Regions:
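Low-complexity tandem-repeat tracts in intrinsically disordered regions
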Residues: 24, 31-34
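Cytochrome P450
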Residues: 1-20, 27, 37-457
């Protein structure tokens, strides 16, 4: 049943005009600032009685339930397509939690919400909101996900020390060597083979092990807990809680060892920062968990989806073989094109009344951003459902935007380039071993991707 819509308010300053900056709550005037919720912003000097009033924000729409069903292959979510077209700022209810939330789907609106300080992640902590899963993946009291500047800036600065250009240059040869070894193993196993088993599954974990400092013998345990940590089914609550506890214990043990070993991996960076009082032990563990999720499970599925996209677009695959210098640009377009997750991620709370896309979002309202819909917004990406390596605009939102833009993006790009480049070099005749519709994809998870990817050559 639709919930009662929130009452319309007096009009507010337009959020996306040069006259009313989105990052402040006052309208410019000559003299003192005027309140944010006035009927009009003076264009110059003093307001004229003839100045027309801006349109009233539209009444709040009814609340719609979004079950976030599994989708075939790389199909975009039809619910998001509908909202982006007809109701770009909508009210929704998700499978878990309480209440309703706003869902923002258009590219410019998503960029606005993710960069405006009036939308807070920190205020989500401890609040019951409608959500995608029964328990949070990350700690709501530590780490980067649920904090705002200036605390977020302090934590991000620590983690950024591990994501320098120098560290990526050190890591890339190791990644290239690991990819070559894995593909040699696939060649020895013979065709047909499962590319997820031989490359996309073990490769990100191997790179993560080198980057974070995970021992070889612990790799499979880390993979298993990563899968459970991101499960989203109704029956997955206890399994996810157990995985969260096991992950935190494993990482805490790794950080304790790093305090004595003084190694230059991410665990060493975090352990030193905690020992010197820059961050707490809980923050160090939560930061490492964030890297595990983005650097292991997410890369596995996203890179597998990229390869599936190429294998189902043979002309694009052939072009990459002929023009390998195109690979970095192709990877950016694949990040935009591939629906990397189901549903939405971490919400924000409006700290004051803000107008977005013609809707008045009240202080205290919950707001989600649909990055998937933004990446298929035809206003930003003409012919958005086409895979186009020559696209002029490549500023996708697959890694988010604003202060919470994914720190691991530089590593994810490197890994995608290494994997795709290695496959094209080692198996120039690679193709799917089954019809595209027979490729099995993950079910009931937050991150979308192939479960298996049968190939031959």
């Amino acid at each position: 049943m639709p919930l009662d819509p929130a009452p319309a308010s007096a009009s507010v300053c337009p959020a996306h005009t040069s006259a009313c900056p989105a990052s402040v709550s006052t309208c410019p005037s000559s003299g003192s600032a005027s309140p944010a919720r006035v009927s009009a912003c003076p264009s110059s000097g003093s307001a004229s009685p003839a100045t027309p009033k801006p349109p009233e924000p539209a009444p709040a729409p009814p609340v719609r339930f979004w079950p976030v069903d599994d989708l075939p292959g790389l199909d975009p979510d039809p619910f998001l397509d509908e909202l982006s077209r007809d109701e770009p700022v909508a009210r929704i209810r998700l499978p878990f939690g309480e209440g309703w939330a706003w869902l923002v789907t258009r590219y410019e609106d998503v960029r606005f919400v993710t960069s405006d300080p009036r939308f807070s992640r920190e205020r989500v902590a401890g609040r019951e909101v409608t959500t995608m899963r029964p328990v949070p993946v990350a700690s709501q009291t530590a780490g980067l996900q649920y904090v705002d500047p200036p605390r977020h800036t302090r934590l991000r600065r620590v983690v950024a020390r591990a994501f320098t250009g120098r560290s990526m240059r050190r890591l890339r040869p190791l990644a290239e060597r690991r990819a070559a070894e894995l593909l040699d193993g696939m060649a020895r196993a013979g065709a047909p083979a499962d590319l997820m088993e031989h490359l996309h599954g073990p490769f990100p974990l191997a790179v993560l092990r080198d980057f974070l400092g995970v021992a070889e013998e612990d790799r499979q345990d880390w993979a298993a807990t990563g899968e459970a940590l991101l499960s989203a089914g109704a029956d997955s609550g206890e399994r996810a809680r157990q995985a969260a506890r096991a992950t935190r214990e494993r990482i805490a043990g790794l950080l304790r060892r790093r305090r004595e070993e003084h190694r230059e991996d991410l665990a060493g960076v975090l352990a030193r920062a905690a020992a010197e009082g820059e961050i707490t032990d809980d923050e160090a563990v939560s930061l490492a968990i964030a890297v595990q999720v983005s650097g292991g499970h997410a890369v596995r599925n996203n890179s597998g989806s990229m390869m599936y996209a190429l294998l189902t677009h043979p002309a694009h695959l052939d072009r990459l073989r002929r023009e390998p210098e195109l690979l970095p640009r192709a990877v950016e377009e694949l990040f935009r094109y591939v629906p990397h997750r189901n549903g939405v991620g971490i919400p924000r709370i409006a700290t004051e009344d803000v107008e977005v896309g013609g809707r008045l979002i009240r202080a205290g309202d919950v707001v989600y951003n649909a990055y998937l819909a933004a990446n298929r917004d035809p206003r930003a990406f003409p012919d958005p459902d086409a895979l186009d390596f020559d696209r002029d605009h490549l500023a996708h939102l697959a890694f988010g935007h604003g202060p919470h833009h994914c720190l691991a993006a530089v590593m994810a790009r490197m890994e995608a380039e290494v994997m795709i480049g290695a496959v094209l070099t080692r198996f120039p005749a690679l193709r799917l071993a089954v019809p595209p519709e027979e490729v099995e994809f993950q079910r009931r998870g937050l991150i979308r991707g192939p479960r298996t990817l049968p190939v031959t050559w």
